[in-house]
Amino acid sequence: MAMEYQVAEEKRLLYWLGERLIDYRLPVTIGVLLLTGFFAYCAFQLRLVTSFGELLPQSHPYIKIHNRFAGTFGGANNIMVMVEVKEGTIFTPETLNKIWRMTEAIDTVYGVNHNQIESIAHRTVRYLKVAAGGTMRATPVMLGEVKTQEQADEIRRIVHSAENIYGILVSLDDKAALIRANFIEGRLDYRRIFDEVNERVVAPYRDQNTEIFVAGEPRLYGWVYHYASDVLLVFVLAYCIEWLLRWLYFHDWRGALRPTITGIIAAFWGLGFIELIGFSLDPLMLVMPFLITARAVSHSVQMHDRYYEEFERHGWNKRRAIVAAFAELFVPTFSGITTDALGVLVILLVPVVMLQKLAITASFWIFAITVSELLLNPIVYYYLKAPEPEIVLVRDEGIFRRVVTRAVDAILSRRGQLAVLAFWLVAAGVAGYFVRGLIIGDPTSASPLLWPDSPYNVSHQRIQDKFGGVEPLIVVAEGLDRDAMKDPATLRRMERFQRTLERDPSVGYSFSLADIIRAVNSVFHELEPKWGVIPNNWVDVGGLFFIYFSGSPPTETAKYVDPSYTTAHVTFFCKDHKGENIRRILRRCKDFIFSGQLEDLGIEVEEDKGRTIISSVSNAVRWEQAGPSWLVSTAEHAGPGPFQRGDRIVRVGRTPVGDLASFRSALTVETANASLIDFALERNGSVVEITVVAPWKAVFKLAGGLIGVLAAANEELFRNDVLMNVLGFATMYVIVLFTYRSFAAPLFLLGPLMLANLLVNAYMAGRNIGINIHTLPLVTVGVGFGIDYGLYIVSRAIEEIRSSGNVEQAVRAALLTSGKAVSFTALSMTLVTALWSLSSIRFNAEMGSLLALWMAISYVGAVTLLPVLLIRLRPRFLVREAAKVAPQD
């Protein structure tokens, strides 16, 4: 039976809705339970899967190059197995036979690309052998197992004389050998690869004198899956402790049960939705379900605390208390859920499939809280037995209430207010200093997903120490015509490229076709060092290629060059994958490519007032005109070309040019596959259109390998990071604007939140936690934590000022009621979230600590800075409510 309530006009609809939910409780309950059962069924079908392709920004130019050539030149999913002996060298029959068998074993692991295995015991690793009669052929280093020490000594001699092996696949001290295997990206099963490598490659061959270390992306994610069960234990432990804390706070099993119902229903809906739309759950994102469930529990604690308060206020009438609690908290609860859900959706801006899927599923999951928290809440309370009055009264007499009261009195005193403002001012200044160290990408050479002393990071570091660089950056050299890779100028440009980047401290070594040609030429001339150079004509280069690749199947030569000699690659093996180092290396790559193209065109450029001007023209480059086009020529009649000093470059191809950066971008885009290049030049006040034949035979294209795909991800995050933050805060601003119908109200709520965001970013910088595709979604969800706390306090202050008419009294009452529930929620969730620091997965542990800190800072801002600002600035959206006298029941 419906009851009459004397409430403000804007609340009447909510009270009516609460009554209707109770009246129609049976059909509503059945409907929710049926849907929950369906989603629960879907949730139990959910699998933990990491799809490598979904981690990449597929629209990025680097990823397009990576996808085109990963199957031939190598991708980002390599496993490196290092065999190291403690005593002696690897050149003994026993150790060499281990390497042989381990190489055969890794060739049987699921998903391996059989043509992209590198080992001194694999058929693809060859050396030049001069046979009787002066004939030369490329022969595998090992043809079978080694039976005598003489055979082992011969293999050592071969290795020491081969530039493509010594120092690359065998360490310089002869104590370690490296087996490198690339995996097909469409067949990556990290758990299976991890188990098979352990069973077939590692365990059978490790002994007292032989250590085996394994690293690489598939191995890294294999360890993540290995530790996934630990994450479940942390989750269960955290939730049990949180249940205990709720029981201690409410002194009632209902207070512990009601938020649990909310969390379980929301979890079933969220996990079921992920499976329903065909997505999967990444093991590194397991902390996300915990966070969203925590949000559901947080809202439910507020509702339960208000229900007890209204139960006492309405003379122990359960129905009136249920409806009043529902109606009074509907606005802040719904606004908080909406800001969280829409805030997560801004992740859709990042063109990474995994993040976009996460944005969609997390947003739905958060919206699902409205079902359990708002739609079902009055019904659950109606079915539950009403609490005993003694239990309700004891909540206001416990130690927690006394501590909150004293803290509120201290904060709102005149001296306390000044201390709060001073504290946040100093904190903002200190955070502003440290936040400059926050970077996009990984800040350390070790993997941030696992602890520094984890088996994976120890193995990675040992391999790095022995071989100097194991993380590949692949730059593709794509010719404009067939046989472009036989052009001596192209090979020399490759060689210059290698020497230029090898000066970077983060590049260990490099490899390209130029290395093969120099080595073959030297062997062809009886190992004379002076012949270890690139020949001057196409015919000699082609002959050397024929010598080296003759007798090799196409699948083996394809990893160096395609059958038409149109496309090859330069691979740089980097020492780490730090974000700043990746950016520097890629910048040097771009500088080399750009300067090489300008050198071939015979021009130098400079920027003048946002325009690109040709500053000088080289006399070394001679041109002749062939019909409408200009081409570089060595003919006697060749002369000056189409470019003149002082020309302003207006357009390249169809791409307009402004400053120097736009010219670099235009030149890269328009010369990618073109043999003819159109230029529009402004000369003496008029525009001159010219067409030149590309003076190069091949174009370098970035970038593949692990470093290339990480660079692409980092660039997308850097490009969208600021925009996401702006849109996230803008979304919150709009929602709060409509919630309180005030342009100033969002500023009061977002101000403390922005300061909390600044402090957390400073913490990330100080702890060497970078922004990457794994940390981004959790950081984005964390931004919304503080807004919920503030919404409950402001809404209660507005409600209280209608009774007291005094800002100070209203704010104090809000802190002692909603603020008390906020305090319990924040403190308990901070504690249980911090338990994630026990995880064996460093990423989950650091994210748990980070989000615990975020909750704590957001809470402190909501209960200190926000109320002080409300009291001292007396905003109109709050003061105007004093004129409204709340009707009495």
Regions from the PLM with identified roles:
Residues 1-50, 54, 68, 160-161, ...:
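Membrane-embedded transmembrane helical bundles of large multi-pass transporters/channels
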Residues 49-117, 477, 482-493:
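Juxtamembrane extramembrane loops of integral membrane proteins
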Residues 76, 89-100, 129, 186-195, ...:
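Solvent-exposed, non-transmembrane alpha-helical starts
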Residues 78-89, 136-141, 175-185, 433-445, ...:
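Short, hydrophobic beta-strand segments
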Residues 97, 101-170, 176, 183, ...:
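Alpha-helical transmembrane helix bundles of large polytopic membrane transport and channel proteins
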Residues 143-253, 264, 492-495, 548-601, ...:
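Extracytoplasmic
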Residues 411, 416-541:
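Juxtamembrane segments of multi-pass membrane proteins
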Residues 600-651, 655-658:
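PDZ/PDZ-like domain segments forming the peptide/carboxylate-binding groove
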